[in-house]
Amino acid sequence: MLNLYDKLREIPLFQGLTSDNLMQIIGQTKFSFKKFGKNDIIKKEGEKCDNVAILLSGDVKTIAYADDHGYSIEEYIKAPYIIQLEHFMGLSPHYTRTFTSIGESNTVEIGQSDLMHISDEFIIFRINLLNIVSAIAQKAESKLWRPMPADTRSRIVFFLKSHCLYPTGAKVLRIKMTRL
C-alpha cells in the first residue's frame, strides 16, 4: 500500500492531493496492476482505450505510424507516464500508438467509473485531469499554426517535433527519402 501511495504521488493526476485523500482513493478504487517483460506490448495502436493506464516503473518504446503506414516514429519514455490520457474519452477512444516494454515494466489501470468517481469526489484531481487534457489539446493546436521552415534541416526537425510526444530524447524515424 505504501509503495502505491509513493508511486501515485509522482503522477501528475494525483499531485496536490493530501495524504488522507490518497489513502481514501487507494482504499476505494479498483486498481488493475500489470507486469510486463521485455518486448511485451502494453497497449497497441487501434486498441480501445477504456482504462487510464499509468506506467509506474520501467521504460517503454512507443511507435506511431502514419495513417497509410508509410513511415513511423519511435520514441522512448520513462516512468512515471500516463499513457494517452487524451484518448480515454471522446469521439475516438482508441490508442494511436503502440507502447512496448523495453525491460521489466509495471502499470496500473483505473477504469472509467472509478476515474469519474475520483474526479467527482476530489476537486484537485478534477483540475489536474482538465489541466493535462487541456495542455495536450493546446499543444496540438499550436503545432498546426507554426510556419514551415525554409531550409531542409529545419524542415526535418519541424517534422519530428510535430509528430513526437516529447521534443527531447532518442527518436527513430523510418521513412523513405522520396517520402521525406
Q: What is each of the regions a protein language model found here?
A:
Residues F159-L180:
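Phosphate-/nucleic-acid-contacting segments
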